[in-house]
A protein has these predicted regions:
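N-terminal maturation segment of proteins
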Residues: 1-181
Length: 181
């Protein structure tokens, strides 16, 4: 089914072709990669701003804590992206660390799927609210990570972001789909 969704997008917006070949191309062709480290960071920051603005349309409760996009420190710059949680009282923001090194080797296509998985409506939304609920929730639910629930929510959130219009280009949608293969 996911390959079929990719094929439809490929046929409608990229002139058709073989899915596997196109996915290889979007990861290697400079036309589908970033030019500078600053461009990687700006693209993700702009997308996060759009996601934050869309959340009230889908959720009645939002976390007090903000979430920021930051580049990985140099010693860890080979990662693809990860979320570090906010504080329980909401005063310290969550951080979404992204790799900006080697921008010409970094495909634009999957940036948004990763961002939505890790921030809004993904891990940050779910995790920050769980922390901020305090005693309204059992401590195990607040402090221990349940990977089945957390990753299930984050995968769902990638598709929810699509329903909210947060994948503005066909290439972004290809990235959403290809991350789910």
């Amino acid at each position: 089914k996911i390959r079929e969704e990719i094929q439809v997008t490929l046929d409608e917006h990229f002139g058709g072709g073989d899915v596997s070949e196109f996915l290889r191309r979007v990861n290697e062709d400079p036309a589908f990669t970033f030019e500078t480290e600053e461009a990687v960071l700006q693209y993700s920051t702009d997308a996060l701003d759009a996601a934050k603005a869309a959340m009230p349309r889908a959720f009645g409760v939002l976390p007090k804590a903000d979430v920021l996009v930051k580049p990985y420190p140099e010693f860890a710059e080979s990662g693809s992206g990860e979320y570090h949680s906010s504080s329980e009282d909401g005063t310290r923001p969550g951080i979404f660390y992204i790799a900006v090194a080697d921008p010409t080797g970094r495909s634009i296509s999957n940036q948004l799927a990763t961002l939505h998985h890790e921030t809004f409506p993904g891990h940050h939304l779910q995790g920050a609210i769980a922390l901020e609920l305090g005693d309204q929730q059992h401590p195990l639910a607040r402090y221990l990570w349940n990977s089945g629930y957390g990753e299930g929510w984050a995968l769902y959130s990638e598709r929810l972001a699509d329903e909210l219009g947060l994948y503005p280009t066909p290439l972004d949608r290809i990235g959403l789909y290809s991350d789910q293969i």
